[in-house]
């Protein structure tokens, strides 16, 4: 019998083992859809971004006009622009849900997969940040100024580092040029790290909602999960297209429709919604270096999660106390996101500080404690 080319060809064999004949647990739920959705988001962002880059000019005098020109005069330029801007929001929605799934079901015990995932999150955040600067509106300019300035809090080398990043003594043309270069490069880095992420995942195989070994019951990825992923894709594309076509500027800041002006500071400088939780943590500490450290810790804390797992069970499926704590953490993150969008005044300052404290307390202290308590209650 002639060998199946899908299984013998050097390149097709890899694709086959990753996407077609991949042995997959038979009971993974829709929460396992987000990996493929993130891949689709990345491809969409790279394609729309590439087409937008063809019409963009990375120069302070022309950037704002070139974006307006793309939206007005390029065929479907408005659609590319809005898909790219809102696609970023959906990228973050998917990655937050993907991380939440990993936390809930103990997927972080696959340490290499988890750590590459954290690197992917950081790279995505960097990409989104430099991308937000490109239209060179007011919020682009002041966001870039405020966030890059945080590096000056690093002792001894801080100021030098900031001026090196800016390419001068303030955010100006060199800054915009290098941010465009970085925004073009980073998504391809994300694609590369994604392949490493998948490589590590396929070493161990997927986790499942029960958190137990699924070796006894595996099914091929195609057609079962390929069709399930396509369903997930259509469910995601519906709100993305609805947002893009009906209310494209809903998640943006009106301030960014004003060209950048170094002489006028906007009343409230705030990042896009997906950074607000970290921004709230940054603002809640009345010290520059302390705030920067808390900001870094708010994301890097994910690297500690595997070491804080004290339960004898992997997933939270059968652990009601940990489940309660998990949803408290979700509520806490929503509060942080809301507080980050509010001005720095009386009720919001204290709410932000309490929510920031709760965030670190839940992750660093309460999760391990409750895990150990549940072991004791179950005599494990």
Curated annotation (Swiss-Prot):
Cofactor field: heme b
Positions that bind heme b b566: 98, 197
Annotated binding of heme b b562, by residue: 84, 183
Keywords on record: Electron transport, Heme, Iron, Membrane, Metal-binding, Mitochondrion, Mitochondrion inner membrane, Respiratory chain, Transmembrane, Transmembrane helix, Transport, Ubiquinone
The organism's place on the tree of life at top rank: Eukaryota
One Gene Ontology MF term: metal ion binding
This protein's GO CC annotations: mitochondrial inner membrane; respiratory chain complex III
Binding site for a ubiquinone: 202
Transmembrane segments: 34-54, 78-99, 114-134, 179-199, 227-247, 289-309, 321-341, 348-368
Pfam families: Cytochrom_B_C, Cytochrome_B
Subcellular location, record wording: Mitochondrion inner membrane
CDD domains: cytochrome_b_C (cd00290), Cytochrome_b_N (cd00284)
Cofactor mode of binding and number, as noted: Binds 2 heme b groups non-covalently.
Chief localization: mitochondrion
GO biological process, one term: mitochondrial electron transport, ubiquinol to cytochrome c
Membrane topology: Multi-pass membrane protein
The protein's assembly and partners: The cytochrome bc1 complex contains 11 subunits: 3 respiratory subunits (MT-CYB, CYC1 and UQCRFS1), 2 core proteins (UQCRC1 and UQCRC2) and 6 low-molecular weight proteins (UQCRH/QCR6, UQCRB/QCR7, UQCRQ/QCR8, UQCR10/QCR9, UQCR11/QCR10 and a cleavage product of UQCRFS1). This cytochrome bc1 complex then forms a dimer.
Note: Heme 1 (or BL or b562) is low-potential and absorbs at about 562 nm, and heme 2 (or BH or b566) is high-potential and absorbs at about 566 nm.
Family per similarity comment: Belongs to the cytochrome b family.
Entry function: Component of the ubiquinol-cytochrome c reductase complex (complex III or cytochrome b-c1 complex) that is part of the mitochondrial respiratory chain. The b-c1 complex mediates electron transfer from ubiquinol to cytochrome c. Contributes to the generation of a proton gradient across the mitochondrial membrane that is then used for ATP synthesis.
Protein's UniProt name: Cytochrome b
Encoding gene (name): MT-CYB
């Amino acid at each position: 019998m002639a060998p199946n080319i899908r299984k013998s060809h050097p390149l097709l064999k890899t694709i086959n083992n990753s996407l077609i004949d991949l042995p997959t647990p038979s009971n993974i739920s829709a929460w396992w859809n987000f990996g493929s959705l993130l891949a689709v988001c990345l491809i969409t962002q790279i394609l729309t971004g590439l087409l937008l880059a063809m019409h963009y000019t990375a120069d302070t005098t022309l950037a704002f006009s070139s974006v307006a020109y793309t939206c007005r005069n390029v065929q479907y330029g408005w659609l590319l622009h809005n898909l790219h801007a809102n696609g970023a929001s959906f990228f973050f929605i998917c990655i937050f849900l993907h991380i939440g799934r990993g936390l809930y079901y103990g997927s972080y015990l696959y340490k290499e997969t988890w750590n590459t995932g954290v690197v992917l999150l950081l790279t995505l955040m960097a990409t989104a940040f430099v991308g937000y600067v490109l239209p060179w509106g007011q919020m682009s300019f002041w966001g870039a100024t405020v966030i890059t300035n945080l590096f000056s809090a690093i002792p001894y080398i801080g100021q030098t580092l900031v001026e090196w990043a800016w390419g001068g003594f303030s955010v100006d043309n060199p800054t915009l040029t290098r941010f465009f270069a970085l925004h073009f490069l980073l998504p391809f880095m994300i694609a590369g790290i994604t392949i490493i992420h998948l490589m590590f995942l396929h070493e161990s195989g997927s986790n499942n909602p029960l958190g137990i070994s699924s070796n006894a019951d595996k099914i091929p990825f195609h057609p079962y999960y390929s069709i399930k992923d396509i369903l997930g894709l259509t469910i995601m594309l519906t709100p993305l297209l609805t947002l893009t076509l009906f209310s494209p500027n809903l998640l943006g800041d009106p301030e960014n429709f004003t060209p950048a002006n170094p002489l006028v500071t906007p009343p409230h400088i705030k990042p896009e919604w997906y950074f607000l939780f970290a921004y709230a943590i940054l603002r809640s500490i009345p010290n520059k270096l302390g705030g920067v450290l808390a900001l870094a810790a708010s994301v890097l804390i994910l690297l500690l999660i595997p070491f804080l797992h004290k339960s004898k069970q992997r997933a939270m499926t059968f652990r009601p106390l940990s489940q309660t704590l998990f949803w408290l953490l979700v509520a806490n993150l929503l509060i942080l996101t809301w507080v980050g969008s509010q001005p720095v005044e009386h009720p919001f300052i204290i709410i932000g500080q309490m929510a920031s404290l709760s965030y670190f307390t839940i992750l660093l202290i309460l999760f391990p404690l409750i895990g150990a308590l549940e072991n004791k209650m179950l005599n494990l």
